[in-house]
Curated annotation (Swiss-Prot):
Subunit structure: Heterodimer of GatD and GatE.
NCBIfam families, per the entry: gatE_arch (TIGR00134), PRK04028.1 (NF003107)
Recorded catalytic activity of this chain's protein: L-glutamyl-tRNA(Gln) + L-glutamine + ATP + H2O = L-glutaminyl-tRNA(Gln) + L-glutamate + ADP + phosphate + H(+)
Family: Belongs to the GatB/GatE family. GatE subfamily.
Full protein name: Glutamyl-tRNA(Gln) amidotransferase subunit E
Species per Swiss-Prot/TrEMBL record: Desulfurococcus amylolyticus (strain DSM 18924 / JCM 16383 / VKM B-2413 / 1221n) (Desulfurococcus kamchatkensis)
PANTHER family: GLUTAMYL-TRNA GLN AMIDOTRANSFERASE SUBUNIT B MITOCHONDRIAL AND PROKARYOTIC PET112-RELATED, GLUTAMYL-TRNA(GLN) AMIDOTRANSFERASE SUBUNIT E
Biological role: Allows the formation of correctly charged Gln-tRNA(Gln) through the transamidation of misacylated Glu-tRNA(Gln) in organisms which lack glutaminyl-tRNA synthetase. The reaction takes place in the presence of glutamine and ATP through an activated gamma-phospho-Glu-tRNA(Gln). The GatDE system is specific for glutamate and does not act on aspartate.
Gene responsible for this protein: gatE
GO cellular component, one term: cytoplasm
Any one GO BP annotation for this protein: glutaminyl-tRNAGln biosynthesis via transamidation
Any Pfam family matching the protein: GatB_Yqey
InterPro entries found in the cross-reference section: Asn/Gln-tRNA_amidoTrfase_suB/E (IPR017959), Asn/Gln-tRNA_Trfase_suB/E_cat (IPR006075), Asn/Gln_amidotransferase (IPR018027), Asn/Gln_tRNA_amidoTrase-B-like (IPR003789), GAD-like_sf (IPR004115), GAD_dom (IPR029351), GatB_C_1 (IPR042114), GatB_Yqey_C_2 (IPR023168)
Keywords: ATP-binding, Ligase, Nucleotide-binding, Protein biosynthesis
Disulfide feature: none
Length: 638
């Protein structure tokens, strides 16, 4: 997969797997766990600020969010939110169903369950929690799962409330919808025992399987999220948030290792050049006059804003380093730009390693060096075009990041991009953001609770695989696909419902082969929900359609949502063929092709079968057609 030798780099990876639980109500109120797309009649506004922790400290990540000075607006759909989400009413008692799932999951991972659970408040003031904190409860610690022959430590399992959904964002305002706020979420955190990208995928898959095997995991986009903690020898611990897809995990790890290795190379080069943090000046220079007559559209636009100008900092000894690629499509200059955007709120930066470009001419670059007194042979210049206050804050952040570059890799929280690269998000949060939830009494884990939870402990994936092959008659490959599928719980329910009517292999194939195939063909499979699948299988079980018609029926329903299955069957002409009709069609096919049949006896079956299937495909079981054709040909060709 990669040329990186991960054992030499000393790679350590820890996973945090977050999965929404499919419970009837939210974690601390009676509201249903349903997302609402209806127009919200209630909208309210909040401004959030950080509070000091129990030891009098303010978390630096919370401080960053506060400095953005954002207004937060909240849409409150009445069907899935109440005064608890609006932080106008104390939380109710914890959802016991969610607690039981968490206890069962902890047991399945050999964890030590805490006998007295205290709900905590974790400070979050990015607006995603109306109260400014997320309620979270530590359920269990110190467990493990097996990856091949190796133990992977499971450090903690927490039960917490999910955040609100971000709907829109502008420069001054963020808008959220609070229907998702409070949905129960389990967070499983592994120890940093993972040492290569493929192992990380296996471990994430296994934890995800265990959660799904409880039968209580929600499905759909956004219901599962992986965060990664990654470090290498000589580098730093970096948290990467929001890896949505399993297949991206290995790529994110590879690209983060590459980034840290490149940053260490840049550090070594800076040291070699004699650069130290102390000689990186934070002197910000107004260079607006250099660009008064610029042809750059971006700079012109900035200068047209009242108070707009162009400002610069000189990075002594950095020439050529800002253009070094540290991840595919991202350079060291991209890292500086991330800091400028987050801390200054600007759109981006220019730097001399990429100029002349973007309408900025060679003459303007030369004038820039003259104006700042920088050495064109060894120095780099970073410029920002914006109002002075924002530009100054952005360039201060650039200088701070440049100083860190001389030391090495910074500890930080980064966001995953869809291509597996990452961007700076905020400093790593400290321990100062957690304090007790005083509105919820301690929860005591009694033998009665553990007895209830024991009924939800998932069967290990290995045993489930063996069962599907032995009892359900699935191939090993198909059984593995089912266990890895998000509709695993649906599969088990449908197998039980259609026992003796539809083979388990047909149900499995519908879920893991047919539906993904339709997606690849451009069919809008988001319109195929559990009810649609069940309706189609009902039609198969009741002999209204043959199993061969399943793809066509699902495709038609997906393209015409709201249309009844009976109408679809009628429009597609998929009514089941009777045995007498089949016999008649076989006789007609034989009569029509008698000359070919007698001339090519060895191909007689293919000739007749092909002719008959033109008329009955999707309307009767192909195996039955084949059986009837063979019987008829046996009579004729004696």
């Amino acid at each position: 997969m990669s040329r990186i030798n991960y054992s030499e780099t000393g790679l350590k990876v820890g996973l945090e797997i977050h999965v929404q639980l499919d419970t009837a109500r939210k974690l601390f109120c009676k509201c249903p766990t349903l997302l609402s797309e209806a127009e919200a009649r209630e909208v309210f506004t909040r401004y959030l600020r950080p509070a000091k922790s129990e030891v009098g400290e303010i978390d630096r990540a919370a401080l960053l969010e506060w400095k953005k000075n954002k207004k937060y607006e909240y849409e409150a759909p009445v069907e899935s939110s109440c005064l608890v989400e609006a932080d106008e009413e104390p939380p109710h008692e914890i959802n016991e169903d969610a607690l039981l799932v968490a206890l069962a999951l902890a047991s399945s991972m050999n964890m030590r369950i805490i006998n007295e659970i205290h709900v905590m408040r974790k400070m979050v003031i990015d607006g995603s929690n109306v109260s400014g904190f997320q309620r979270t409860a530590l359920i269990a610690v110190n467990g493990y799962i097996m990856d091949n022959e190796e133990k992977i430590g499971i450090q903690t399992l927490c039960l917490e409330e999910d955040a609100a959904r971000k709907i829109d964002e502008s420069e001054t305002t963020v808008r959220y919808r609070i229907d998702r706020l409070g949905i129960p979420l389990v967070e499983v955190a592994t120890a940093p025992d993972i040492h290569d990208p493929e192992q990380a995928v296996r471990v994430a898959l296994k934890i995800g399987q265990l959660i799904r095997l409880t039968g209580r995991a929600k499905r759909g986009l956004g219901t599962i999220r992986q965060d990664l903690n990654i470090s290498i020898k000589g580098g730093a611990k970096v948290e990467i948030k929001g890896v949505q897809h399993l297949y991206l995990i290995s790529k994110v790890i590879e690209y983060e290792v590459l980034r840290q290795l490149k940053l260490l190379e840049i550090r070594d080069e800076l040291v070699k050049r004699g650069v130290s943090p102390e000689n990186i000046s934070d002197n910000i220079i107004d260079v607006t006059d250099v660009f008064r007559d610029t042809g750059s559209k971006i700079v012109k636009k900035a200068l047209s804003i009242p108070g707009g100008g162009v400002y610069a900092v000189v990075l002594r000894g950095f020439k050529g380093l800002l253009g070094i690629e540290i991840q595919p499509g991202r350079r060291f200059g991209s890292e500086l730009a991330d800091y400028a955007r987050i801390w200054g709120g600007v759109g981006g930066i220019f730097h001399t390693d990429e100029l002349p470009n973007y309408g900025i001419t060679r003459e303007e670059v030369q004038a820039l060096y003259m104006k700042t007194g920088a050495d064109p042979g060894i120095d780099a210049i970073v410029i920002v075009a914006d109002v002075k206050q924002k530009a100054v804050e952005a360039l201060k952040a650039v200088v701070e990041r440049a100083r860190i570059a001389v030391i090495g890799v910074p500890e930080e929280t980064r966001a995953a991009n869809p291509d597996g690269t990452t961007k700076y998000m905020r400093p790593r949060p400290g321990s100062a953001r957690m304090y007790p939830e005083t509105d919820i009494p301690p929860i005591y884990i009694t033998p009665e609770l553990m007895e209830k939870a024991s009924k939800l402990i998932p069967e290990p994936p290995e045993k489930k695989l063996e069962k599907y092959v032995r009892e359900h008659g699935l191939s090993t490959e198909l059984a593995k696909a089912v266990i890895n599928d998000l509709r695993l719980d649906l599969y088990e329910r449908l197998v039980e419902k259609y026992m003796g009517k539809i083979p388990a292999s047909i149900i499995a194939s519908t879920l893991v082969n047919i539906i993904p195939s339709l997606r690849r063909d451009g069919v809008p499979i988001e319109n195929i929900d559990d009810y649609v699948i069940e309706d189609v299988l009902d039609a198969v079980a009741n002999n209204e359609i043959a199993k061969e018609a399943i793809p066509d029926v699902l495709s038609s329903i997906a393209r015409n949502p709201g249309k009844s299955i009976k109408d679809v069957i009628k429009e597609l002409g998929l009514g089941v063929v009777s045995i007498s009709e089949l016999d008649e069609l076989i006789n007609e096919a034989i009569k029509k092709n008698m000359d070919k049949i007698t001339a090519k006896r060895e191909k007689a079956f293919q000739i007749v079968m092909s002719e008959v299937m033109k008329s009955v495909r999707g309307r009767i079981d192909g195996a039955l057609v084949a059986e009837k054709v063979r019987e008829k040909l046996k009579e004729i060709l004696k």
